[in-house]
Each structure stands twice: as structure tokens, then as C-alpha cells.
């Protein structure tokens, strides 16, 4: 009896470290629905891999700063290859402070088809403008072998649903003459698609 009790206590105590080392299941990454005038796009936001850039995007979503904005730029390099851009267009009432740059060499999030990224000037100047890749764009990734500013752009999310909507936006005609404050000639859509609302989805959605 005593021997069985000692064995049981030993087995119980031996199991404690294994139980203590069991890691909790990480929370799923947030998903955001962009309800546009062309249809719904759902993006998975990589809060686990690019937390600074992901949190910045989610602040714009949660504060409803993306409601009513448009896809104002389409860069068509080739058939279904390039990117579309949306954001607050530097509107003072909608902009939040700039964020620290997270290069792809640190996050591991590459500029692949359907990836969301943030435009910038110098590192640490990104704010409320966002791009979505059509096709893989490795030239946007950090490349330490290049001279000068080789940190690339910060990728932070991907399209989980609605690539057909994104393609519809990309394929829409652009104006040969329109510009935005003198820039992006030939890249401004004739009829920009509006983001009606941008909202987080519940995990079960």
C-alpha cells in the first residue's frame, strides 16, 4: 500500500512540469472587413508578426478613420500585376502619428500576392496610407545587399477573402490626365471605389 502510494505521488509530481510547460493556444489574428462599393474584402492582420504596423492599421479601423475613404491610386505594371492604394490621403483630421518602421527582414512578412503594406518616405514616416499587392513584389521587401535606404516597406496583413473584388478595383479604368496634387498621373481611377466601412470581424465570422 505504501509502495503504491509513493509511486502515485511520484507519477503525479513528474507530470507537473509537463502540464506547467503546456503553452496556451495563441489568439487568432484579427480579421477586418472592408465593405467597399465594389464588394467585400476581408484581410487577416498579422498582429503576431508585425505588431507595430498591424496595431497602426487597427487604430485607423477602430477609430473609423477609414470609413468613406477611396482607393485613389492604381499602379498597373502588367496584367494583374502592380498594386492599389487607399488611405486618408494625409488629411490632417484623419492622420495618426507616424510609426516605427518594421522591415520585412524582421517580420518575415513578404510582399506576396494580396499582401497589405504601408507606403513611406524615410523609415518611420508611415501613417494612414495602405497598399495591396497584385502579384508577388519582392522589390518592396528589405534587401540588406542594396546601398542606401534598403529597408523596404512594412508588410502587415493579407487578403483572406475578396481577391476577385480587388481585381475588379485594379482592372477599373484609370484617367490619363487626372493627378492628385500634381502626382500619380495615369494612376488615378476614373471612378474611385469607396470603402464604406472598415470593421473588425468577430472570431466566429
Each language-model region and where it sits:
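Cyclophilin-like peptidyl-prolyl cis-trans isomerases
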Residues: 18-205
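Intrinsically disordered, low-complexity sequence elements enriched in Ser/Thr/Gly/Pro
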Residues: 1-2, 29
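N-terminal signal peptide c-region/cleavage motif recognized by signal peptidases
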Residues: 13-17
